[in-house]
Amino acid sequence: MSRFFANGSDSESESSEEEVQAPNFNKASAFQFSDDEEEVKRVVRSTKEKRYENLTSIIKTIRNHKKIKDIPNTLSSFEDLTRAYTKALPVISKEENGITPRFYIRCLAELEDFINEIWEDREGRRNLSKNNTKSLGTLRQKVRKYIKDFEEDLSRFREAPDQESEAEDEEAHVSDAGEAADDSYAGFKKEASVTAPKIAKSAPAKSVPADDEDSDDSIDWDSDSESETESSEDENQYQNMRERFLKRSTEKGEDKGDDDKRKDKRKEQKLKIRKRAEDDEDGEWETVVKGHVVEKPKMFEKDAEIDIPLVLAKLVEIMSARGKKRTDRRLQIDLLFELRDISDQHNLGVPVSVKIHFNIISAIFDYNQKISEPMKMEHWALLLEVMQSMMKLLLANADISISESVAEEHEEYITAPYYIRGCPLAAVERLDDEFTKLLKECDPHSNDYVSRLKDEMNVVKTIELVLQYFEQCGNPNERCRIYLRKIEHLYYKFDPEVLKKKRGELPATTATSVDVMDKLCKFIYAKDDTDRIRTRAILAHIYHHAMHDNWFQARDLVLMSHLQDNIDAADPATRILYNRMMANLGLCAFRQENVKDAHHCLVDLMVTGKPKELLAQGLLPQRQHERSAEQEKIEKQRQMPFHMHINLELLECVYLVSAMLLEIPYIAAHEFDARRRMISKTFYQQLRSSERQSLVGPPESMREHVVAAAKAMRCGNWQACANFIVNKKMNTKVWDLFYESDRVREMLVKFIKEESLRTYLFTYSNVYTSISIPSLAQMYELPVPKVHSIISKMIINEELMASLDDPSETVVMHRSEPSRLQALAMQFVDKVTNLVDVNEKVFDMKQGNFFQRGNMGNRGDRGYNRNQNNQGGNWGGQRRDNRNQRNRNQRGHHKNQQQQQQQQVQTIDEE
């Protein structure tokens, strides 16, 4: 309607006439074929344009999918993109000399960053649906595999992304490739080509200073009016509908010229802005920041006399804002540092400086509002520095006493002895907890974790300073608390000097970590009056002994402390430490050749199937639906840092090997025992599942190696068993993780030989009448005295029915045990007897005594008896007597059946 009223006519009649005259065009002409049709040229696009247009459209689709995090569609679009790029390779090699287009490299880089961002966000990844999670893993693998061919291009792109110029290049590619498609509506082409330069003119004008605002407004108004007139001209131009939608040949030269003009104008505007900024820097001009400027509050007046009461009053004023809603916590820390500098400049004394230090520590702790989240690294470094500085001041001045038992009104800063209210022990405990949170927050496989772990030296140094202070002026309870903090940083660390000292390579006076642990733990045993600190100290002490192969000391501590009786009543952190202690104790027993004890230590952890959770080394994703978000958050806070983890595969391997060395000889000894018990349920299940498989390939995983070794041991083949347990793959995965791994491997081979010998004797004792001891020693590569000792133990324990003939060095087998056929027959008789008994009981329960009466319950007899009883007047008593007689007959019949069955069993045994 705007074009009819554009002239602003004075009378309504004129406007109505214009409205009537406007549609005077012949309607049929809109569908007529133009005589000039031959002059209209169709657009012929090159192969490059088609391929590039296809690539850019797919890239645009991928970006849209990334915005809404639609991972399955992103995956399908990425596959389409790779196929489209493969089709475009001939064009790229011909037109671009084999150089991959920048916009394609940009797309790959953005896609890689997008995947890494989602993958590192563990919280968000857990909340993804099953389809998104599966698609994310597939997309990540495909992208990582695909971009290997573009590593050099990606590295060059990441070094100099050139975002602005790259965007322009991409726009140019898109415009070149899709020029014909965009011009399909020829009526809008002219409008776009006319208005684009005017928008480009008006856009830079916004960056010009305020003096040119009026001119900018006038330019904008002119452009609006011009665009309206152009649109009306375009609508009047295309009188033929077919002509309107015909594709025309594009004037690429003019469009490129317009693009070059736009780029030149943008560069000119940027140069002008840079020159003005340089001119401003030369002068005294300052850039005004939007919003009001908050001035930093003044500490003291100019003429104020700085003394201790004034500084303390200012300190109270600053700390009074602590915990309030609108408090600027960063400004509060800055003010406290400034106050400390003022105190040092005016020599107000060490007590005032210590008090300010302590308040700075409290302010840094308050900076992070969420306790569950770690603090920033800049605050962490500042906290360590201030904490160590305060403790050095306290150690250098013995007349300063800082304690939480000192009331604020009793603080003394002027005359010695000085008394300050505060608790450095609570501060160092909080610092230690913050360090643990920092470690748990970052990726354990990154360099960031290693750099943060280096701060443990500073944390331990700070704990040492606090420990020295409380050894001078602390009570026993405070010393126990700080001793426990030092123990928790020491108990899991291996000290090779302990084993060297055992072997005599170091003098006996050398101080080791075991001596330090003994000193700290014994003080806690004697002085602590809380069960928790003493319990944790005992657990850490046992762990440290077990780590350094002090098996008997660790075992005695466990037995004397009776921890296993009351550990269920302890807090979760203590129970986690108990589980860690039992795991390490089992590894120690295994290294010291106590296979049975190792199995007993590890069975409670491994039989549950979730040692990862019990050791606080991660959460199982299968049980995610069983816990709420709050429970998951609490469990994450209890997790151990990565450098304190125990290798779960090593733990499981030790448990399975120990179970194999115990279970296989036991199975061979009780092969026909129906009441045979399982020593290890987990190992038994692994063995049975392998036996149920119709086709078993060569072992690959650790479990498959142990199961294959167990099958070889059942046949007495110790060499195959040893090869399955000790090989290159198992050494890399498990055995090389042990200290002195060669000694552990030798111990394993020795145990495999001995248990294979026992299994062989159990399995084939019914085949031999006698067997030579030297031949057994040669078969299993064991010394003859060792073989003699093993067989003697088996005979003494009544495991093997045989006798030793020393002159001939043979083992004479006794035929006291039933043969295989006899054992199977006895099992069959037992099962048949049980089946008969069960069937009789079921029959009696269902039918009662009805079918056991005379004549199968004949009604005529019962009527006759009833008439006789009625005549005698004692019908009820006679019925009771008959029932009792029938019951006696049944019991006698059942006894006769049992006697007959026993006789049958005896005859079978005699045969």
Swiss-Prot record:
Main localisation: cytoplasm
Biased composition (Low complexity): 196-208, 897-911
GO molecular function, one term: translation initiation factor binding
Alphabetical GO biological process terms: formation of cytoplasmic translation initiation complex
Ranges annotated as biased composition (Basic residues): 885-896
Ranges of biased composition (kind: Acidic residues): 11-20, 162-171, 210-236
GO cellular-component term (any): eukaryotic translation initiation factor 3 complex
Pfam family, one: eIF-3c_N
Keyword terms of this UniProt record: Cytoplasm, Initiation factor, Phosphoprotein, Protein biosynthesis
Composition bias type Polar residues, residue spans: 23-32
Compositional bias per record (Basic and acidic residues), positions renumbered to this chain: 241-271
Residues the record lists as Phosphoserine modifications: 34, 165, 175, 184
Annotated spans, Disordered: 1-38, 155-181, 196-284, 851-911
Domain PCI: 642-818
Subcellular locations according to the entry: Cytoplasm
Family, as annotated: Belongs to the eIF-3 subunit C family.
Assembly and interaction partners: Component of the eukaryotic translation initiation factor 3 (eIF-3) complex. The eIF-3 complex interacts with pix.
Biological role stated in the UniProt entry: Component of the eukaryotic translation initiation factor 3 (eIF-3) complex, which is involved in protein synthesis of a specialized repertoire of mRNAs and, together with other initiation factors, stimulates binding of mRNA and methionyl-tRNAi to the 40S ribosome. The eIF-3 complex specifically targets and initiates translation of a subset of mRNAs involved in cell proliferation.
Protein name: Eukaryotic translation initiation factor 3 subunit C
